[in-house]
Amino acid sequence: MAKQPEEWHYLNPEFDNTPLEEEEEEEIIWVSKSEIKRDAEALKKLGTELVELSAQELERVPLDEKLLASIKLAQKVQREARRRQIQYIGKLLRNVDEEPIRQALDKLKNRHNQQILVLHKLEDLRTRLIDGGNEVIEEVVALYPMADRQQLRTLIRNAKKEKEANKPPKSFRLLFQYLKDLSESA
């Protein structure tokens, strides 16, 4: 049999002249090993955050049954078993769309931050009530129509007396609790 010349494929009209490497580059998306490890570590961290949630908070997160059972098991076990279980949860999270889970976690965190902001606003309002006069009381009554002016004035007066006499701030706390109850009922 005759040996074909090395440039034979250039002479053959049926041969596709495009290099094979270019075709493969279009189809294959190359991901580095480090990136895969970073993604796995991020999923493990997400799994740890899920394990740290309470049962009521877990109900608000969209999880399948197998993942939820694994999280509940991880909450029960200790030390090395917990680490292995979190690793397993990370593996399960690879097969699940993580975006809805992350969104639910963000909502839970933001809700907590919003509650803290409301408490800070109430503390500022309490301080303004004690330091201010009738204008601040009118502002509170306008903000919370079900507020009792007489009770507000009594709590403010008692808080001022306690502050002047250097007594424990019982009325100070009662005033805050009253404002908190008003904000929750509004």
From Swiss-Prot:
MF (Gene Ontology): ribosome binding; rRNA binding
Subcellular location: Cytoplasm
Chief subcellular location: cytoplasm
Keywords of the record: Cytoplasm, Ribosome biogenesis, RNA-binding, rRNA-binding
One Gene Ontology term from the biological process aspect of the record: assembly of large subunit precursor of preribosome
Coiled coil spans: none
Record-stated family: Belongs to the DarP family.
Organism placement in taxonomy: Bacteria, Pseudomonadati, Pseudomonadota, Gammaproteobacteria, Enterobacterales
Transport among keywords: no
Protein name (record): Dual-action ribosomal maturation protein DarP
Repressor among keywords: no
Gene3D superfamilies the UniProt entry points to: PSPTO4464-like domains (1.10.60.30)
One CC-aspect GO term: cytosol
Domain of life: Bacteria
Signal peptide: none
Function: Member of a network of 50S ribosomal subunit biogenesis factors which assembles along the 30S-50S interface, preventing incorrect 23S rRNA structures from forming. Promotes peptidyl transferase center (PTC) maturation.
InterPro entries noted in UniProt: DarP, DarP_sf
Native source organism of the sequence: Proteus mirabilis (strain HI4320)
